[in-house]
Amino acid sequence: MAPSVHPSSSPLFTSKADEKYANVKWDELGFALVPTDYMYVAKCKQGESFSTGEIVPYGDISISPCAGILNYGQGLFEGLKAYRTEDGRITLFRPDQNAIRMQTGADRLCMTPPSPEQFVEAVKQTVLANNKWVPPPGKGALYIRPLLIGTGAVLGVASAPEYTFLIYTSPVGNYHKASSGLNLKVDHNHRRAHFGGTGGVKSCTNYSPVVKSLIEAKSSGFSDVLFLDAATGKNIEEVSTCNIFILKGNIVSTPPTSGTILPGITRKSICELARDIGYEVQERDLSVDELLEAEEVFCTGTAVVIKAVETVTFHDKRVKYRTGEEAFSTKLHLILTNIQMGVVEDKKGWMMEIDHLVGTDSFPDET
């Protein structure tokens, strides 16, 4: 049973052909789903190449109850953003890295991925179709969610016979509502990943297990949860949806991407930027003791970008860190976002511009 698409009959927000922007209160954007006009869909059989995808009206999809994603969690997702610059361009931040990461994840889960070229082209098409939903400069970004899911029917544990590559978008503001730093709780009871598992790829199955810890932490007033390694329970690894860094003196340290944490694209970029401005960067095991003795702590990720950590609580010990205008994380945030927003020259070659010369006449009607 091949998946089918059902366009939404009642979109929450609207976009008209003659509007530069969709009807959204940009100043009130948070990090919640705002459905846009279109999505991208492509399909392929196991071991074959993906078909040329289509831009279709955003809507529900129907798949077999025996689909691999539903029964065995055979699915991957990515997350990246499109930005609108002051001079009107729309750009993507390092989409080639997301394409490569999806390839790595697909190999781990025995899935057939789109080629890196098709991935990037599909992202461009999807953003172009939804260009009115890219927020004005400084008002947020268009979050892009590529999905690779096993939609073919399987009964026993096996690779799905068919896959769907789908991309949808949503305009977003800040991931965390509070303007101050994060208040993290170290979870000493649950583990996010273990060696030999799937912690190093963006598998759909990695995320629902952290929700219990996250709910418990937020009910106690914390912003998020920091998980420890499964082998010793003594080293820090990853926050629920982002990587973590510590600063002491001139040394910036972050846990290594050795298979149990996600190799974040923002993480990779921050390591490079920190070295550029004269800091030593160490990717190594970091103990809880080192965390508690750090001068600064911050998190990185597509959703959070760079976010300072104000406090960490481990058992009954609570440590406060440097935040604010003088913080190293604030400096890094400005450097990175200036590149992303086109405020400064992109000497890294990280930004990819979307061609505005292509119109939207070929996109299907939403009705």
From Swiss-Prot:
Superkingdom classification of source: Eukaryota
Pfam families, A to Z: Aminotran_4
Entry's Gene Ontology BP terms: branched-chain amino acid metabolic process
InterPro entries attached to this UniProt entry: Aminotrans_IV, Aminotrans_IV_CS, Aminotransferase-like, B_amino_transII, BCAT-like_C, BCAT-like_N, BCAT_family
Cofactor(s) listed in the protein's UniProt record: pyridoxal 5'-phosphate
Keyword set, alphabetical order: Aminotransferase, Pyridoxal phosphate, Transferase
Gene3D superfamilies noted in UniProt: 3.30.470.10, D-amino Acid Aminotransferase, subunit A, domain 2 (3.20.10.10)
Keyword Transferase belongs to the record: yes
Modified residues (N6-(pyridoxal phosphate)lysine): K202
Coiled coil feature spans: none
GO molecular function: branched-chain-amino-acid transaminase activity
Protein family: Belongs to the class-IV pyridoxal-phosphate-dependent aminotransferase family.
Matches recorded under NCBIfam families: ilvE_II, PRK13357.1
Protein name (database record): Putative branched-chain-amino-acid aminotransferase 7
Provenance organism: Arabidopsis thaliana
